[in-house]
Amino acid sequence: MPNMAETKDPVRLRLLSLELLKQLWAGHEAMCRSVVRAASGSNLDCSSNNLEMPLSQETSSASSVAPSSQDKRHMLDPLDSRRDDTFDVAWYVKFNSRMDSFLPATGQHQEPQEELRPPSVPLLATQGLKGPVSLGGPKGLGPDKTQVPRSILSRLSKPSKPRVTSQESAVPESSWHSRPYLGYDWIAGSLDNSSPVTSEPEAFFSMLQRFRENNKEDCVCNSPEAVFPGLQESSGVEEDHECMYCYRINRRLFPEPVDPGAPCRLCGIPRDEKGPGTLVEPVQVRVSIPLSIMDPPHQYRIHRRKSFDASDTLALPRHCLLGWDILPPKSEKTSVPKSLDLWSSVSYGAGQRRDLSATSPPCQALPAQVTPPLWSEPQVAQLCPSH
């Protein structure tokens, strides 16, 4: 009989612990639903007295199981206590997994859950979210199995770090005049592009519009002939008018008409209908000289190691290159040939040898035969006379 009682008491204790865990789970679900309802209401105002709950509910809930566990402490087997601990830990892991799956749905209402807690929610259920929960038995049964679940509410409550972006703040146009100009902005700012008409108020433009509406016939014209009648009638031209035609200097320095068929700008008479000008009645022309005509067509490099002397030439390019091209005259007694012809150079050398043979003694004079080059015509051999 004692053995039967010892085996029934652990089973009864296990059943009581399961019932207690079911009650805790039901309270946790009720707490989560109440937190969601409290967060959805915007006009929830709880006093500071309701935020601090007494610990009487926690002690009363824990005392319901304590006497039975203390009475049967000496009857528990170490193996049974280990099996109970492993069962409690397995259930607690399942409990935490269900709790973590439910927390993301209520994570967006973190402030009401931490700060505003309705008075109907027990403190025992909320303690599992903020601190470690011990599901182990008394001190003599074995070590406490504690686990600290990582709550998503602590991560969401952290303030976000400021980020640096490349988008500049919009600067109003009224403050542009106070900013310094750089580069092309300075050039554009120095130009007078502002019109005095744009600075007029709106009343000025409204008055101008009313004036144009009242005097529509004078302000609006459909035919250009009525605006400039003098361009169509040549009779209105003054008697002292002189026609002017435009010419341009070409590369040969001759004037040529810019537009041969263009009439006079004032009277409209073409150039072909005008007679030749005389000394009494000259014809006025306008001649334009392109800048490219004034510049030389070639660029001459001036030698930097020679001197310049402009006394022997009048040409501008040769005048600039005198120190480079002109050399002092060479003497005629030099032995350098005047041409690059090979036959003339050979004949010139033979004449020099003939002069030398005339001054030398007769015994040393030998007949000299000059062989013409292969590419020249055959010539008769020249023999030096012997004395």
Swiss-Prot record:
Residues 70-80 have a biased composition (Basic and acidic residues). Residues 60-69 have a biased composition (Low complexity). Keywords: Phosphoprotein. The modification Phosphoserine is found at S307. Coiled coil: none annotated. GO terms for biological process: negative regulation of cell migration; negative regulation of G2/M transition of mitotic cell cycle. Residues 50-59 have a biased composition (Polar residues). InterPro entries: MIIP. Residues 50-80, 133-172 are annotated as: Disordered. PANTHER family: MIGRATION AND INVASION-INHIBITORY PROTEIN. Interacts with IGFBP2. Inhibits glioma cells invasion and down-regulates adhesion- and motility-associated genes such as NFKB2 and ICAM1. Exhibits opposing effects to IGFBP2 on cell invasion. This is Migration and invasion-inhibitory protein.
